[in-house]
Amino acid sequence: MPKYRSATTTHGRNMAGARALWRATGMTDDDFGKPIIAVVNSFTQFVPGHVHLRDLGKLVAEEIEASGGVAKEFNTIAVDDGIAMGHGGMLYSLPSRELIADSVEYMVNAHCADAMVCISNCDKITPGMLMASLRLNIPVIFVSGGPMEAGKTKLSDKIIKLDLVDAMIQGANPNVSDADSDQIERSACPTCGSCSGMFTANSMNCLTEALGLSQPGNGSLLATHADRRELFLNAGRRIVALTKRYYEQDDESALPRNIASKAAFENAMTLDIAMGGSTNTVLHLLAAAQEGEIDFDISDIDRLSRLVPHLCKVAPSTPKYHMEDVHRAGGVLGILGELDRAGLMDNSVRNILGLSLRETLDRYDIMLTQDDAVKKMFRAGPAGIRTTQAFSQDTRWETLDDDRQHGCIRAREFAFSQDGGLAVLYGNLAENGCIVKTAGVDEGSLVFSGPAKVYESQDDAVAAILGGKVVAGDVVVIRYEGPKGGPGMQEMLYPTTYLKSMGLGKACALITDGRFSGGTSGLSIGHASPEAASGGTIALVKDGDIINIDIPQRGIQLDVAENELAARRLEEDARGEAAYTPHGRERQVSFALRAYATLATSADKGAVRDKSKLGG
């Protein structure tokens, strides 16, 4: 029988000092026999997806204590990728994932907590907490802040839905008036919550459901809706039961590595492909799998991407649907239900509810359930009122979207495409693979060839695009923006956004060893591995080289003879210590970022730290 970790600090005469300090936090004699459960919050006023979380940790803590546990809350950092976008702040986004994972480990291990509730939401916070959970392998439940309502405004006598990306595109479009741009900006992000499309934050919060670590509705139920309160209350109650299952009943099925097994990771990736999720999820799932010592790598993603159809199309891939529409159509379990009926799920995996996926679908898939309370929950909708308050409205859709032929979520035979929403491409330009969000690629661009326009930084590429130096047919190559070369693997949302603003969104391709925002669409290929700073072929590309992209055949090829590439590599090697560094780029890189770069691996490994360099 495992011993409560917290007993290390609460039992024995030699722990009198620790108990004295615990008493100073409000603990009593009765508390010293109870499990100590960390409430890992991420409240900050910097991020709309986290601005409403201040009191939600207390809500969870009160339920933990009412259920027989001791709750202790702490906070992690949280970077807003949208605000950090397009300047030096974006260098810090991906490295913050590692800091979050480490800070959770530090706090939980330093104080010997027995279990955790992770209150996450936005881009790097959920992945960082997920990595920590699998690293620590103690009972955990995720409950995120929830999605933002979609923006809505009236332009040209038509009501349109909006999100952050629309504000960025129209703000840079010279053909849009100042008045219209301002109206779109003011309407795009109306409430608290993670940005309203299938961007990175919402993708990851959906994936925690598929991994079995969060409750039904976690990924899609709006931040503003009163129903979301119940997820937080249930998390507080359920984590105590989960904790006691492990420590008092020796039930290892309560541990995250046994819930988020390889089969669960494959289910999660299958979901991601089916819903056309953010390409960043590839990085984060690979990183989390390594933390949990789970045998899941990019070859698994490639295999799944060839099998799974595209069943759910959401902004930024279409303006028609946002997360509120996904929820109305049954949320994550609506998609998983269609995948299960298509024979693409392992429905034996179990979750924090103690149910198998098969049992969970029977109760929570709107196409199967007879539970009126479940149907009511999935009718939770937007109120259209600007607010930063959680649980501030209780609007309901009159009906569910159960149209699996024409609706937001489709059955396999009516899929948006039989090819999934993400693909791994291989070739001499990316020998270890690169990622494209096929859900956002125009059908006419699935096969594309063009001359390279090479830039050593995102900033140079943006200047060239806005300056008219990039023309239809070009393949924009942005290199030395990988985990090591950036450092920090910046998101390239501004270059892709500005291509659209200049009318080139369907006429150009973009390839980078950096990454893309979940808000990116178009022929945008990221995560080229090995990255330029690690000697990848992308470092050898020259202006005018022809690059051939074939998504159906999963190929990406630099049309340069092998002997010419060998000569270029010798020339690059001859630069000595400057080899595989950007030519003429001036960028201030802090000590913290240099330290990150020293251990960073390429994207095909999840951009995690290279443990071999530490002897581990």
From Swiss-Prot:
Q: Gene3D superfamilies, alphabetically? A: IlvD/EDD C-terminal domain-like
GO biological process assignments:
isoleucine biosynthetic process; L-valine biosynthetic process
Question: What are the catalytic residues?
Answer: 517 (proton acceptor)
Q: What class of enzyme is it?
A: lyase
Question: Which pathway does the record list?
Answer: Amino-acid biosynthesis; L-isoleucine biosynthesis; L-isoleucine from 2-oxobutanoate: step 3/4; Amino-acid biosynthesis; L-valine biosynthesis; L-valine from pyruvate: step 3/4
* HAMAP family hit by this protein: IlvD
Name the record gives this protein: Dihydroxy-acid dehydratase
What is the organism field in this record? Erwinia tasmaniensis (strain DSM 17950 / CFBP 7177 / CIP 109463 / NCPPB 4357 / Et1/99)
